[in-house]
C-alpha cells in the first residue's frame, strides 16, 4: 500500500495500523472515523454537493455557504484577478435576487460579514459565507435556496469562458447549518436543483510535492523596533486525499501538537538557562485540513536584537536534540495527557457555532476531510493502548522525519546579521546536540510530600444550593463548599473563589494590575520551582490556574476524580507552601518589556487606549503596561496572596464532577481544616470609576483605517436587566452590521455587564478595514470618516432605534439555547456560583422565565440608556 512518498508517511503508518477501534468503520484500507450524525450529505441531481446540519444550539438562525473548488492557482487558466472577479460578481445582482445584490439580500435578513467579508478566495477554493441569517419566516429559507442555486447556475448563462469552464455545479457545494430540519431542506434543494442543468466538470491541477535538499534563508525587516524574530518552517508533503477522512490526520495532528509543545517548552527552558529574555516562543503546524498546499511545522522565537545570535543557538540545539531522539519520555507522556485533557474539556462544551460546522463541511468537500465529531476523535485517540516507550519511539520517528537542518527548511529572520553567520550558527548548534547529555532535574509526584491529616469528625451543615441544584456544605470554621453534580468526563473541577483582587494592593501603578496573577507562580512551591510543581501535577492529570481580577481571585483547575487526595494535597501545598523565587521574578521582569513591545498596536492596546480616554483617572486597568512595572510588585503580590489565603472562609470552594455527594464529602472533609480562615472578612476597597460624560472623538494617523467606539452606561444589574442587555447587544450588532454592509468594514461588538466597582453596561465596537475582494463589485471601501458617519447614524438613533418583535423573539431563543448549552460546561457553573457568592448576583435561576419576559420596550429602554451614557470614538486614518 502506498501511504506517502517520504519517510514521514512511513513513520506514521505503524501507529495508524495499531490504533484500530470499534468507533471506526473500515475504508480505503485505513480506519475511518464515524461521521457526525447531525450532518446530512448528498448530491443534487445537477451534481452539486450539499451538507445540511441541524444545530439545536442556535435557535432561529442559520449560516449559508457556497463552496467552490476553484481558486487562484488550482485551475490551468486562472489568475487571482479572474477568480476574485468571479467571486465578487456572484455577490452582485443575479436573476433571482429581485434587482438587488446577493450580499444585500442576506444582509437584509441579518447576515453578518466575517473578517474576510462575505467571500474568501484561496489557492484552491472560493468560499461564500453568510453568518447568522434570521430564518424564523419559512419564506426566508426558500428565498435563500433560490439565491444560492442562482449563484451555482451562473455557469449555464455566463458569457465569460472562465466561469463557464471552472464553475460547473459538480465543482460546488451548498452548506446550510443552523436551526433547520435537514431532511426537509435537502428535499427543497433537490426540487430547486432540477431547474439547473448539469455541466461537465474540468479537471484541476494535481498536487505535486517538491522536495528541497538545502535550506533557504530570508532576511526580513523588523516588525517591532529592537525585536529580532527567528522563524524556521519545514514544509511537509500533503496527506493524500484518499486518506483525509481516515484516522491518519487525527493521529498526525496529535503528534504535531505534542512536537510543538516539546519544542516550545525546551526552547523556553534553554533561553532561561542562558538568561536570554524573550518576547515570544511559539510553535505551529498547518495540516492538509487547513490548506491546499504543503503541510508545515514551524518554530518562532522573538528576542532582543542583541541577544539574537545566542537565541539562534538555543533554538537549533533544542531542535537537534529532538531530531536525535533526546525527548524525555516523562515529558512526552505529560504533554500527551495535557493535550488529551484539553480536548476532553472541549467535548464537554457542546456549544458548536454554525460557522464551525460550515468549516468542517467545506473541508470535507474540498479535501475529503473527516466529518467526525470531536468526541469521536477524542474517544479514538484516548483509547489507544500504547506503552510510553512505544509512544516515544513513534514520536521520535516522526520528529526526525520532519526536523532537519537543511531539507525542506525555510528560515526567516529579522536581524542585522549576515546570512552565512545565521546559517553557520544554526547548523553548528544543531550538530552539537548529537552529544547532548541531559542533566535536567526532573521532579515527580514522589517529591511532593503528602499532607498529614487528622481524621477528626466534624459537624457539617448541608443544604441545597438552589441556583445550581447542587449541595452546599458549611464547616465549623466557616469554610464553604458548593458541589454541582454533572457529567464531567471523569474529572473533578475545582474553583477556590475568594474576595480580594488587585484593587486591594496599595500604591498599585496604573497598568500593574494585569500582572498580579502571574506572580503567584513566580515562586517555589513545595520546595521546588513553581514551574516544576506545575509539571508534576500535570503529569498526574491535574491543572491549576490563578486569575486575580479587580476584586476577586479564582484558583481553579481539574484533576482525575479518582485522585481527590492528590488534588486536595496539591491545592493546599500551592496555597500555603509558597516562597518567593527571586530568580524567577528577575527573569520574568526582564522578558516583560519585550512582550509589551510585541503587543503594541494590537486589539488589546486599542481597547486600553479607548478605555483610558473614557476614564483617564482610573488606575485599575487590566491591560499590562511594562513601563509601569515596579520592582516592589513581587513583594506586594506575595503579601496580597498571603493575606487573602488566610481568609478562605470569605469565599467558596466550588466542585463540579460526577461523584456521589456522600463519597465526595467524606473524602474532602479531612482537608478542610487545612484551609486558613479568619473572623475578619475582606473589605472591598473604595474604587472610583466614573467615565467622562458626553461624546468624545480622537483621530490619529496609522497604517490602516479602523474605528473603535466605547459606550458605558449605569445599569442596575437585575436578572431582568441582564437578559434585556444581552438581547439589546444582539439587536445593535445586527443593525450596525446591516448598515455597514457595502462599506468594506468588519464589525466586532463585545459587551460586559460589570458589577464592580459600580454596576454598568459597557460596549465596545471595533471596525477594521476588509479587502474589497470580500464583497460585491458594487462595494468600494469607505474611508474611516465615511464609515464613522454610518456608525454615528445608528448609535445616535439608539433612543428611537427600530426594534422588531421578530428579531427580539429570535434573539431570545438564541440566548435561551446558548445558556442551555453553556450549562453543560463545568466552568460555567464554577463562574456563576462564584458570582453569586462573591457579588450576590444570580442570572441563572429561572433564566427561561427571565428571558421570556424580555419585551421590545425593555430592549428599547436599554438602547435608550446607551444614548444617554458616555461615548468615546478613536479613529485611525491610514497615512
Where do the PLM segments sit?
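Well-ordered alpha-helical segments embedded in enzymatic catalytic cores
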Residues: 394, 636-640, 788, 858
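M16 family metallopeptidases and their MPP-like homologs
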Residues: 53, 58-87, 99-153, 158-164, ...
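Proteolytic maturation boundary segments
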Residues: 27-57, 170-245, 249-250, 257-268, ...
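Alpha-helical scaffold elements lining the catalytic groove of polysaccharide deacetylases
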Residues: 629-633, 637
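Bacterial N-terminal signal peptides
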Residues: 14-23
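N-terminal secretory signal peptides that target proteins for export/translocation
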Residues: 1-9
Amino acid at each position: 500500500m502506498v501511504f506517502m512518498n517520504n519517510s514521514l508517511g512511513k513513520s506514521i503508518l505503524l501507529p495508524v495500523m495499531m490504533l484500530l477501534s470499534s468507533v471506526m468503520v473500515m475504508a480505503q484500507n485505513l480506519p475511518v472515523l464515524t461521521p457526525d450524525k447531525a450532518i446530512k450529505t448528498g448530491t443534487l441531481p445537477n451534481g452539486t454537493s450539499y451538507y445540511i446540519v441541524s444545530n439545536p444550539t442556535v435557535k432561529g438562525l442559520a449560516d449559508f455557504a457556497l463552496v467552490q473548488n476553484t481558486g487562484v492557482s488550482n485551475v490551468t487558466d486562472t489568475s487571482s484577478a479572474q477568480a476574485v472577479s468571479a467571486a465578487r460578481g456572484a455577490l452582485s445582482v443575479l436573476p433571482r435576487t429581485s434587482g438587488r445584490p446577493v450580499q444585500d439580500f442576506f444582509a437584509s435578513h441579518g447576515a453578518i460579514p466575517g473578517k474576510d467579508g462575505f467571500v474568501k478566495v484561496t489557492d484552491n477554493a472560493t468560499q461564500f459565507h453568510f453568518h447568522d441569517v434570521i430564518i424564523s419566516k419559512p419564506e426566508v429559507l426558500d428565498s435563500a435556496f433560490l439565491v444560492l442555486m442562482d449563484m451555482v447556475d451562473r455557469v449555464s448563462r455566463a458569457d465569460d469562458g472562465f466561469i463557464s469552464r471552472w464553475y460547473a455545479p459538480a465543482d460546488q457545494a451548498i452548506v446550510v447549518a443552523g436551526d433547520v430540519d435537514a431532511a426537509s431542506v435537502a428535499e427543497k434543494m433537490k426540487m430547486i436543483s432540477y431547474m439547473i442543468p448539469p455541466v461537465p466538470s474540468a479537471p484541476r491541477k494535481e498536487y505535486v510535492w517538491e522536495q528541497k535538499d538545502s535550506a533557504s534563508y530570508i532576511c526580513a525587516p523588523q516588525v517591532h523596533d529592537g525585536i529580532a524574530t527567528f522563524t524556521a518552517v519545514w514544509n511537509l508533503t500533503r496527506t493524500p486525499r484518499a486518506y483525509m477522512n481516515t484516522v491518519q490526520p487525527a493521529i498526525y495532528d496529535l503528534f504535531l501538537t505534542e512536537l510543538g509543545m516539546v519544542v516550545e517548552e525546551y526552547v523556553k527552558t534553554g533561553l532561561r538557562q542562558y538568561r536570554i529574555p524573550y518576547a515570544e516562543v511559539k510553535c505551529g503546524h498547518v495540516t492538509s485540513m487547513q490548506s491546499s498546499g504543503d503541510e508545515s511545522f514551524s518554530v518562532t522565537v522573538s528576542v532582543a536584537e542583541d541577544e539574537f545570535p545566542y537565541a539562534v543557538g538555543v533554538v537549533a540545539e533544542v531542535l537537534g536534540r529532538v531530531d536525535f531522539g533526546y525527548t524525555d519520555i516523562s515529558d512526552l507522556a505529560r504533554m500527551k495527557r495535557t493535550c488529551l485533557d484539553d480536548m476532553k474539556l472541549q467535548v464537554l462544551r457542546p456549544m458548536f457555532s454554525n460557522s464551525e460546522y460550515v468549516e468542517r463541511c467545506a473541508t470535507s468537500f474540498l479535501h475529503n476531510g473527516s466529518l467526525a465529531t470531536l468526541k469521536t476523535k477524542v474517544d479514538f485517540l484516548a483509547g489507544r493502548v500504547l506503552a510510553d516507550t512505544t509512544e516515544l519511539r513513534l514520536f521520535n520517528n516522526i520528529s526526525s522525519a520532519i526536523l532537519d537542518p537543511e531539507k525542506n527548511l525555510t528560515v526567516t529572520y529579522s536581524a542585522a546579521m549576515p546570512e552565512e553567520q545565521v546559517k553557520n550558527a544554526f547548523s553548528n548548534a544543531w550538530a552539537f546536540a548529537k552529544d547532548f547529555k541531559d542533566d535536567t532535574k526532573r521532579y515527580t509526584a514522589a517529591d511532593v510530600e503528602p499532607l498529614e491529616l487528622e481524621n477528626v469528625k466534624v459537624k457539617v451543615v448541608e443544604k441545597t444550593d438552589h441556583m445550581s441544584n447542587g449541595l452546599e456544605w458549611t464547616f465549623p470554621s466557616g469554610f464553604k463548599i458548593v458541589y454541582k453534580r454533572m457529567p464531567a468526563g471523569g474529572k473533578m473541577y475545582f474553583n477556590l473563589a475568594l474576595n480580594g483582587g488587585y484593587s486591594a494592593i496599595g500604591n498599585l501603578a496604573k497598568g500593574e494590575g494585569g500582572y498580579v496573577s502571574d506572580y503567584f507562580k513566580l515562586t517555589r512551591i513545595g520546595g521546588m520551582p513553581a514551574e516544576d510543581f506545575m509539571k508534576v501535577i500535570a503529569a498526574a492529570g491535574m491543572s491549576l490556574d490563578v486569575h486575580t481580577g479587580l476584586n476577586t481571585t479564582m484558583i481553579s483547575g481539574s484533576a482525575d476524580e479518582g485522585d481527590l487526595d492528590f488534588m486536595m494535597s496539591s491545592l493546599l501545598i500551592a496555597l500555603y507552601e509558597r516562597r518567593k523565587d527571586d530568580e524567577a521574578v528577575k527573569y520574568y521582569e526582564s522578558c516583560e518589556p519585550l512582550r509589551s513591545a510585541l503587543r503594541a498596536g494590537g486589539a488589546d492596546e486599542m481597547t486600553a487606549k479607548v478605555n483610558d480616554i473614557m476614564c483617564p483617572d482610573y488606575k485599575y486597568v487590566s491591560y499590562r503596561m511594562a513601563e509601569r512595572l515596579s520592582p516592589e510588585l513581587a513583594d506586594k503580590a506575595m503579601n496580597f496572596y498571603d493575606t487573602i489565603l488566610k481568609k478562605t472562609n470569605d469565599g467558596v470552594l466550588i466542585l463540579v464532577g460526577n461523584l456521589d455527594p456522600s463519597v465526595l464529602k467524606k473524602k474532602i472533609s479531612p482537608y478542610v481544616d487545612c484551609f486558613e480562615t479568619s473572623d475578619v472578612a475582606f473589605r472591598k476597597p473604595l474604587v472610583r470609576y466614573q467615565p467622562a460624560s458626553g461624546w468624545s472623538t480622537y483621530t490619529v494617523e496609522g497604517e490602516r483605517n479602523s474605528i473603535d467606539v466605547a459606550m458605558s452606561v449605569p445599569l442596575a444589574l437585575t436578572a431582568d436587566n441582564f437578559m434585556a442587555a444581552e438581547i439589546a447587544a444582539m439587536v445593535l450588532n445586527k443593525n450596525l452590521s446591516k448598515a455597514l454592509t457595502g462599506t468594506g468594514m468588519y464589525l466586532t461588538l463585545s459587551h460586559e455587564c460589570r458589577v464592580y466597582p459600580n454596576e454598568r453596561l459597557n460596549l465596545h465596537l471595533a471596525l477594521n478595514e476588509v479587502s474589497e475582494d470580500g464583497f460585491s463589485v458594487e462595494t468600494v471601501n469607505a474611508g474611516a470618516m465615511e464609515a464613522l458617519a454610518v456608525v454615528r447614524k445608528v448609535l445616535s438613533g439608539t433612543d428611537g432605534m427600530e426594534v422588531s418583535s421578530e428579531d427580539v423573539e429570535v434573539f431570545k431563543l438564541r440566548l435561551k439555547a446558548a445558556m442551555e448549552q453553556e450549562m453543560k460546561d463545568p466552568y460555567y457553573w464554577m463562574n456563576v456560583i462564584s458570582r453569586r457568592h462573591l457579588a450576590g448576583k444570580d442570572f441563572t435561576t429561572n433564566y427561561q422565565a427571565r428571558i421570556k419576559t424580555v419585551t421590545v420596550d425593555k430592549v428599547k429602554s436599554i438602547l435608550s440608556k446607551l444614548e444617554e451614557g458616555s461615548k468615546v470614538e478613536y479613529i485611525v486614518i491610514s497615512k
